[in-house]
Amino acid sequence: TCEIYTDVPGVLTTDPRIVPNAKLLDEISCEEMLELSSVGASVLHPRAVEIARNYGIKLCVKSSQSDSSGTLLESQIQPLPLKRGSLELTKTVNSLEVLENQAVFSLSNIPDRPGIAAQIFEKLSEASINVDLIIQATNDGNNNDITFTVSELEVKKTAEQCELLTIQLGGEYNLKTNMTKLSIQGAGIMGRPSVSADLFDTLSQANINVRLIATSEIKVSCVIEINNIPKAIRFIAEKFKLSDTQIFVNPINEKQDQPEVRGIALDKNQVQVSFRKLPDRPGVAASICLALAENNLLFDTIVQSERISSSKTKDISLTMNKQDREKANLVFEDLTKKLPGSYIEDGPAIAKVSTVGAGMAFKVGTAGKIFRALADQNINIEMIATSEIRTSCIVLEKDCDKAVNA
């Protein structure tokens, strides 16, 4: 075990400067810690956690000022063999996961006010529907869109609940079946924007249109039509040099006994940018990510959701570091020239609140609880992006401390 001594007793559930009664965690997985450390939990540098995760090194974070037992970090993946020389990996992507038989539900033109997301996912939870991806891009006017995925086995009862929700809230819903979720995984993916760019560019070269996009620190997920799966797997495996043992189709996750929420992190160093009225065709997401990567501009959360519309366009929203926004102006101007009819829209001052827990994928209703906690504080959600172990909500900067305390 590698012991690391700091000025805090270990890893806490959240920032004690915001929540004075934050609790010390006895243990946390490296995967959970990567998600937390990437969004503001500064106890450990993400690169230290990444090396521990890759090589199965146990870390224990302790205080240099007390005898507390601290927090133990352990990796949940098969460790790589240690070799002489650098511990840095030349391959950022270490696996591809394929989840088949997914259905995409899109609720469009619903009200944009606090409590709507809570109402939707509480309703789904009451019907015992387990939701996977949840995506909300930035709102357009006074209404909003929320898109989510479920197993095709739950389509009938999900459609019934969506029908009731549109009666209560207004708007409409759309259903797409025969969809599949693809996810590339690797520590620190979002710190390397070229990785997302390579994924979307690879799918574009295969003439595969991406329907949904959601990201976290260690995973980039997208939803495509099921008939494109064999081609997508072949192209992605070739691009990222993945062997058959690194490709998992419908994997069985063994983390079901883990807590649904382990910790909460806050990142105030983000700005929100939306690309409006983009053409709905292969290669658009790739062109955005490639342009940012080529200019060394880091983006964080990036989401693309579905909207019911007669025009064949889509919106993509992302967050990026505040200091990079001005540098991105020329890049964005060039992009919109190449994508006729599109335009850039800057959002208000925002912050990102991320809830992390390895067990949240198996607990029906976790998302509803998170969104209800924000609604009870009258906090509106600007964007939502999820992975299996992280739910990130973009809120107004003025509400961020209140959101963490919620």
Label each residue range with its predicted role:
Residues 1-386, 390-406:
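C-terminal catalytic "cap/lid" subdomain
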